[in-house]
A protein has these predicted regions:
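Terminal targeting signals and extreme-terminal segments of soluble enzymes
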Residues: 13-307
Length: 307
């Protein structure tokens, strides 16, 4: 048995080839959605090895559905969502868009995602036309650039043996988003007593067209990757350790300035509070030259598991 285990793990290490471009193409198709009729869209889910549909996928698809009903040259500036039920990867998701308001400058939409006749997700979005006004931002943290950080895949190769078998497919899957972590800040690292702060560089794994919606939808997808794990850091909780069960409860996001999701962005996250089995997390997204382009906030359930 021991020999078989070593052989299997060794084979897994050899098979961890960077297939992220292929995964990105799958994500782009996943976010495209099928139009059923006016205000009604259908999306598919990809089995990523986890127990349920990835929340970032539903956020990105709901954003796409809403944007399809909005006048040209109006782009999402904020979204606020609740995860109501776990999504089933074996069934399509129906997105029903409610045209709440079409104003002179702003457009408001509500999207309900439905599976098996029940809502699994509810999101309100606001779209705004380009407008002149005052501008300021908080500066980006002074941290190493993406070339000086550790890739997601390199971290996984080192810790395959430590990832619980039931989580391996999920964590070793092909990812459409390239990620580079500061040493000791990956959600795969061994749990230690850490402050609830984290920084990760991320970008789409290939070139994208110039369509604003596609870049926003992909960043919305990526914003749910690892955000909740920030609140686990001070408590020695880790997916790699298998000592926590977690789920996103809600998600809010603001798009401040134009950006490209296929260029490096810094995702700086912090967790001001955790209580009553819920972790509260915030994220700021910067371009490589320090421009603040988006912000995200999420509260998530995190239950400690006894071994």
């Amino acid at each position: 048995l021991k020999i078989c285990q070593i052989t299997t793990l060794g084979g897994m290490k050899r098979s961890l080839v960077n297939m992220t471009k292929k995964a990105l193409n799958k994500l782009v198709k996943l976010l495209a959605l099928e139009t059923l009729e006016e205000n009604l869209f259908r999306g598919q889910s990809e089995n990523i090895g986890g127990p349920r549909v990835f929340g970032g996928q539903v956020i990105g698809q709901a954003l796409t559905a809403a944007a399809r009903t909005v006048p040209e040259k109006r782009f999402a500036h904020s979204l606020h969502a609740y995860f109501l039920r776990p999504g089933d990867m074996e069934y399509p998701i129906i997105y029903n868009v409610e045209r709440t308001r079409d104003g002179g400058s702003f457009t408001t939409r509500r999207v309900v995602a439905i599976q098996k006749g029940e809502p699994i997700f509810d999101m309100a979005l606001s779209f705004h036309k380009k407008e002149k006004g005052p501008s300021h931002q908080i500066d980006m943290s002074n941290i190493p650039g993406p070339k000086e950080c550790i890739s997601d895949m390199d971290i996984k190769k080192k810790i395959i043996e430590r990832i619980p078998a039931k989580h391996r497919d999920f964590f070793l899957r092909e990812r459409p988003i390239e990620m580079r972590h500061l040493p000791g800040e990956s959600m795969f690292d061994e749990p230690t007593n850490q402050l609830p702060y984290k920084h990760v560089w991320m970008k789409a794994a290939g070139k994208l067209p110039d369509e604003v919606l596609q870049h926003q939808a992909i960043l919305a997808y990526a914003s749910d990757m690892g955000l909740l794990s920030t609140s686990m850091l001070p408590h020695k909780l880790s997916y790699a350790k298998g000592n926590v069960m977690s789920a996103s409860l809600d998600h809010a996001m603001w798009f401040h300035r134009p950006f490209r999701a296929d260029e490096w962005m810094l995702y700086s996250t912090d967790s001001p509070s955790a209580s009553n089995a819920r972790g509260f997390n915030r994220g700021s997204v910067y371009t490589e030259d320090g421009i603040l382009v988006a912000s995200a906030v999420q509260e998530g359930l995190m239950r400690m598991l006894k071994k």
